[in-house]
Amino acid sequence: MKNTFNTSNVFANAYSFWGYVIGFILSTSNRLYIGWFGILMFPLLVLATVAYIAAFIFAPPVDIDGIREPVAGALLYGNNIISGAVIPSSNAIGVHFYPVWEALGFDEWLYNGGTYQFVVLHFILGAGAYMGREWEFAFRLGMRPWIFVAFSAPLVAASAVFIVYPIGQGSFSDGMPLGISGTFNFMLVFQAEHNILMHPFHILGVAAVFGGSLFSAMHGSLVTSSLVAETAGDLSLNVGYNFGQEDETYSISAAHGYFGRLIFQYASFNNSRSLHFFLAAWPVIGIWFTALGVSTMAFNLNGLNFNQSIIDSSGHLINSWADIVNRADLGMEVMHERNAHNFPLDLA
């Protein structure tokens, strides 16, 4: 019997199969774009989410300070949604990479807070892949790349508190806990140890967040209030709007005229591109600065301080808000890790 096996057909089928797979991955017609970055993003974020939910519910107490006094963060150990958290890795681990195979067993890995590193590292890498996917999808559609630049702001902010700060402080136990009250605890301790409220870059971040909220509300309300009416007065404005139409749906000149007279002329934009660039750039740049500030304070380049009180020519103390802030910082610091050391560094 003649052998009819043909290797060229096998390679052709293989190429056609992989061509189909690659075409599906890179297709911009899918309901959910995948892309090369999506191959990384989807499994990483799924793993991070599943591990976070499981740890939040079931994880046993973690020896966060490395002094054999475990702290419980899971719901099954008496916490609620507010007090629960994924507790950071033990101070005994430091900044060592701590996958499960580095522990003697799974119980030891849980006791030392290995779940924190697992969730944080998978999440940061997954979020980075999401940012890359934003660029990739925009590239496929012929769009400009600024969407992924904007997303870099929350990504670098998360990286600052989850990665850079623990590295600078020498231990992942100093990272931000993955919970509501844990976040507040992190903020209070950060203020106590670094005086972040007096750091110029944090001030820029506050201006970015609150200013961005204000500008967003102003822009949305102005646009909604200056829609071009294409219908009779008894019909909704939406009836005269067709999705994808070339004509603008609102009058920027009317909005500009209104706001220019409400405040003053040059407080209002008359160019849509400049306006939307400003709306994107303001919060993004401010959050970049905050992330940079946290990253520098990670290495103890702290906010402005007033460690020496104000005194008059006779040597008498002149009470100021700086004294109150210092006392508040010391009070927060003595309550932080109160069993791990006898005195805070500022008092020792």
UniProtKB/Swiss-Prot annotation:
The entry's keywords: Calcium, Chlorophyll, Chloroplast, Chromophore, Electron transport, Herbicide resistance, Iron, Magnesium, Manganese, Membrane, Metal-binding, Oxidoreductase, Photosynthesis, Photosystem II, Plastid, Thylakoid, Transmembrane, Transmembrane helix, Transport
Residues the entry annotates as binding chlorophyll a PD1: 202
The record's account of how the chain is modified after translation: Tyr-165 forms a radical intermediate that is referred to as redox-active TyrZ, YZ or Y-Z.
TM annotation in the entry: 33-50, 122-137, 146-160, 201-222, 278-292
The keyword Secreted appears for this protein: no
Catalytic activity of the protein: 2 a plastoquinone + 4 hnu + 2 H2O = 2 a plastoquinol + O2
Family: Belongs to the reaction center PufL/M/PsbA/D family.
Assembly and oligomerization: PSII is composed of 1 copy each of membrane proteins PsbA, PsbB, PsbC, PsbD, PsbE, PsbF, PsbH, PsbI, PsbJ, PsbK, PsbL, PsbM, PsbT, PsbX, PsbY, PsbZ, Psb30/Ycf12, at least 3 peripheral proteins of the oxygen-evolving complex and a large number of cofactors. It forms dimeric complexes.
Listed name of the protein: Photosystem II protein D1
UniProt gene name: psbA
